[in-house]
């Protein structure tokens, strides 16, 4: 056994009680009824072909076995997670069908083939975590149970065995602070609405778009209980927020003897105060928090606490002592629990690591390549960590990722760091880049680098139903462009693993180079090369074009092709304006707006690109018309201004959550650019400079708009994509 693998097993063993799947591994049997239910939901009639069973783990490592028995496909696993990933392995590499976050393709064959030989695999990494805390803001704040059920099914089938649940924690906070004397109104004013609430749990803000209603608190608890129960059924550990000391701003006034450290601001928002963990009041609050949390959601063994997340200060509090007391409060309530924390922007601090029992840490490392660091055993002082994949920020729809980071660097760090015990899907949004998701989740079951070209060929076959030459050619283009971005060609403070944004979504300016403040400023790959993917996709065999997976990819590639065109066109518009060439300026800006119209029409054809689907989910959570308006504002503002004027303009949070979505493109992004171009055209006509446009007011007007949008797709994606090909004069591939 390699030395690093041996150290990894030791590190994983120290967390054995922290993952329910690992608990299940200790027993050779478990009830497979929940897994059978999942197959029925996802595979429908095909589920009857499977015989599910259990096997013992091999030396502590999870494993699955695929075979045939009595004319059935037999899949056995040592844990629920291993069993389900074994089913997925069969689907991917024998049946050659796909279950993905962005569509399902089961094919037209009634009976899937039996495996020709026995297949056995062991998990390389014991822990397969999913979901950034920001998912609850940028993707899922208003999801219904059917939507969550489907997402959990896909995650479980992808081998995930730990997932954060933040929904419902507002009620835990509510009961905790009510118990020490806060009034109902005071604490509901403090608790933030759902789309912004996870930043409160991380200690970044409070009080946005409140007050939260008691009805909404109850609904969210009911929903969260259902989510947590399903996770446990499928062998997924629910990761719950822990208590590390956030308190309302007036806490010191109510409790003069308490020692509260003001945390200043985060992006223009006043942060919650931080109660000194050495205080008796801290222990009292923590005990109450965990007690109420247990009553509502039961026990877990992983608790997320982000102390000093993106700022904050320890003041005069010794961090080692404070960290020890935070951990002790957790262990007093849950003796075998581990403290999950992010490695991000300087965290975890060295002095924090000094004060804790590092065997009870669970570090999600999403900072390992911000400035490339390879010795995470040294950096984390042996504390167990997971390799985090974060190729998307803000829930944005941008296509692309640093695939070398997944196919090569992940395994390299695993070989050289004995404390690397798992992987973590940590994108800030979900349901984008299904290719990267599929590849990343598979890496926890592979110990060696993957040959990307071969993996893509297999991916194309299962995603579309055949090894179509045009589909393969399109993906060869994608693999050499959007999925070949590098971290060494962008400045340090950029989102180095993400692709560039669409300038259509940017706050208008002739010199703008990104929509959100921290995004890459330039193309991350050859835009001309990328263009060749669309003509190839349009020539995929007709019989393969109707699948949900092909339709999604066609829209995504055509959408990205149009988005990239914005970066070619804007400098031409600027040159015409600077040169006083009004005729060229008007012609070019008409083309710009026409491309945006085409973009909106294209996006309207697919359910994953509809702002109407996002907003439709909000209405069922409201109990009154006033609450409906507040929640609608909450859901809209996270896409546009993000917060109030101070946060939007002063901290430049505007458009951080921008998305290529039908309705949003036409009624918000296009309106901004049309107004801006009209202002510049008037300047060219009159020679007088116009008044500056109040972009926050434009965004806030859309946030408060009552306009409804369809949550159902309409139109023909193929026809519109062909029109885009013609409009952009893309060269058709040779037959």
Task: Show which residues each predicted segment covers.
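Second-shell loop/turn segments in exported
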Residues: 72-77, 136-142, 214-215, 276
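Active-site-adjacent substrate/metal-binding segments within catalytic domains
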Residues: 125-144, 155
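Catalytic-core regions of glycoside hydrolase
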Residues: 47-49, 98-99, 104-112, 131-135, ...
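C-terminal substrate/ligand-recognition segments
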Residues: 520-543, 555-578
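Bacterial N-terminal signal peptides that target proteins for export
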Residues: 2-10
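Extended, compositionally biased alpha-helical segments that mediate assembly or anchoring
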Residues: 658-735
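Bacterial N-terminal signal peptides
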Residues: 10-20
């Amino acid at each position: 056994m390699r030395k690093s693998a041996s150290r990894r097993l030791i590190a994983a063993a120290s967390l054995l009680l922290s993952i329910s799947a690992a608990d299940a591994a200790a027993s050779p049997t478990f009830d497979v009824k929940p897994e059978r239910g999942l197959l029925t939901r996802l595979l429908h009639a095909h589920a009857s072909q499977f015989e599910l069973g259990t096997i013992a783990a091999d030396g502590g490592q999870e494993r699955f076995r695929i075979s045939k028995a009595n004319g059935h496909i037999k899949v056995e696993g040592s844990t629920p997670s291993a069993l389900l990933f074994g089913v997925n392995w069969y689907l991917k590499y024998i049946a050659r069908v796909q279950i993905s976050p962005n569509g399902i393709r089961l094919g037209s064959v009634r009976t899937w083939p039996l495996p020709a030989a026995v297949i056995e695999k062991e998990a390389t990494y014991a822990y397969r975590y999913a979901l950034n805390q920001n998912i609850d803001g940028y993707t899922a704040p208003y999801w219904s149970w059917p939507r969550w059920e489907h997402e959990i099914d896909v995650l479980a089938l992808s081998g995930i065995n730990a997932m954060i649940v933040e929904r419902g924690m507002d009620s835990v906070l509510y009961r905790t602070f009510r118990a020490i004397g806060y009034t109902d109104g005071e604490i509901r004013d403090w608790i933030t609405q759902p789309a912004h609430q996870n930043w409160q749990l991380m200690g970044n803000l409070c009080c946005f778009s409140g007050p939260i209603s008691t009805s909404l608190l109850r609904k969210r608890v009911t929903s969260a209980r259902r989510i947590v129960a399903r996770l446990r059924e499928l062998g997924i550990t629910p990761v719950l927020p822990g208590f590390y000391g956030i308190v309302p701003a007036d806490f010191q006034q109510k409790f003069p003897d308490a020692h509260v450290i003001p945390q200043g601001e985060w992006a223009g928002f006043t942060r919650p105060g931080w109660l000194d963990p050495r205080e008796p009041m801290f222990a009292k609050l923590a005990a109450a928090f965990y007690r109420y949390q247990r009553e509502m959601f039961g026990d877990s063994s992983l608790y997320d606490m982000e102390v000093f997340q993106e700022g904050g200060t320890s003041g005069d509090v010794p961090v080692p002592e404070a960290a020890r007391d935070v951990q002790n409060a957790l262990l007093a309530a849950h003796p075998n629990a581990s403290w999950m924390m992010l490695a991000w922007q300087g965290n975890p601090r060295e002095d924090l690591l000094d004060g804790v029992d590092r065997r009870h840490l669970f570090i999600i490392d999403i900072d390992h390549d911000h400035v490339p660091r390879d010795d995470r055993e040294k950096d984390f002082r042996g504390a167990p960590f997971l390799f985090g994949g974060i190729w998307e920020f803000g829930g944005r729809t941008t296509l692309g990722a640093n695939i070398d980071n997944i196919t090569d660097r992940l395994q390299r760090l695993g070989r050289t760091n004995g404390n690397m015990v798992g992987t973590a899907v940590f994108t800030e949004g979900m349901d984008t880049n299904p290719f990267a998701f599929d590849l990343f989740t598979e890496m926890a079951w592979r110990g060696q680098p993957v040959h990307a070209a071969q993996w893509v060929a297999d991916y194309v076959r299962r995603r579309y139903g055949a090894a179509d030459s045009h589909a393969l050619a399109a993906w060869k283009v994608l693999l050499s462009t959007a999925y070949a971005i590098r971290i060494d060609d962008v400045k340090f403070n950029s989102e180095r693993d993400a692709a560039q944004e669409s300038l259509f979504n940017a706050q208008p300016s002739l010199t703008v180079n990104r929509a959100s403040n921290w995004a890459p400023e330039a193309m991350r790959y050859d835009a001309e090369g990328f263009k060749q993917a669309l003509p190839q996709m349009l020539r995929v065999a007709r019989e393969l074009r109707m699948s949900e997976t092909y339709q999604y990819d066609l829209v995504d590639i055509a959408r990205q092709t149009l988005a990239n065109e914005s970066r070619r066109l804007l400098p031409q518009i600027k040159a015409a304006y600077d040169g006083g060439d009004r005729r060229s300026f008007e012609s070019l800006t008409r083309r710009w707006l026409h491309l945006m119209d085409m973009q909106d029409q294209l996006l309207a054809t697919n359910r994953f690109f509809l702002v109407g689907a996002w907003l439709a989910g909000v209405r069922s959570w409201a109990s009154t018309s006033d609450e409906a308006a507040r929640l609608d504002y909450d859901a809209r503002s996270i896409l546009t201004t993000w917060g109030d004027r101070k946060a939007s303009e002063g901290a430049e949070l505007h458009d951080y959550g921008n998305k290529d979505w039908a309705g949003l493109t036409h009624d918000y992004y296009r309106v901004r650019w049309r107004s801006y171009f009209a202002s510049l055209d008037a300047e060219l006509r009159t020679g007088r400079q116009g008044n500056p446009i109040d972009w926050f007011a434009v965004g806030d007007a859309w946030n408060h708009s009552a306009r409804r949008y369809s949550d159902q797709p309409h139109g023909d994606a193929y026809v519109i994509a062909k029109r885009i090909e013609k409009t952009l004069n893309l060269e058709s591939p040779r037959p």
